[in-house]
Curated annotation (Swiss-Prot):
Domain of life where this protein originates: Eukaryota
Name of the featured protein: Ferredoxin
Keyword DNA repair: no
Keyword tags: 2Fe-2S, Chloroplast, Electron transport, Iron, Iron-sulfur, Metal-binding, Plastid, Transport
Domain 2Fe-2S ferredoxin-type: 3-93
One biological process term in Gene Ontology: ferredoxin metabolic process
Alphabetical list of SUPFAM superfamilies matching this protein: 2Fe-2S ferredoxin-like (SSF54292)
Function summary: Ferredoxins are iron-sulfur proteins that transfer electrons in a wide variety of metabolic reactions.
């Protein structure tokens, strides 16, 4: 399956379709969008975003705790879309600040 992903960035929203077996960050880059990242392994907060609507599978994440995930935070480098999803990007400061 493939889902519509909408990323709300400081430069404005971007939308693309993302298969459910491709990480959202990887697909965004394939579409030509620059997003923040560091480790690409779900072990830091550089790529953090916040889910506005929809759901993801980020079971490869090792950084976020259950409370942060419950609060809507997502690591885009290890997030597969599980529905049409809207995510606010560039949320590292909100997460760790």
């Amino acid at each position: 399956a493939s889902y519509k992903v909408k990323l709300i960035t400081p430069d404005g929203p971007i939308e693309f379709n993302c298969p459910d077996d491709v990480y959202i960050l990887d697909r965004a880059e394939e579409e030509g969008h620059d997003l923040p990242y560091s480790c690409r392994a779900g072990a830091c907060s550089s790529c953090a975003g916040k889910i506005v609507d929809g759901s993801v599978d980020q079971s490869d994440n090792s950084f976020l705790d259950d409370d942060q995930i419950g609060g809507g935070f997502v690591l885009t480098c290890v997030a597969y879309p599980k529905s049409n999803v809207t995510i606010e990007t560039h949320k590292e400061e909100a997460l760790v600040g």
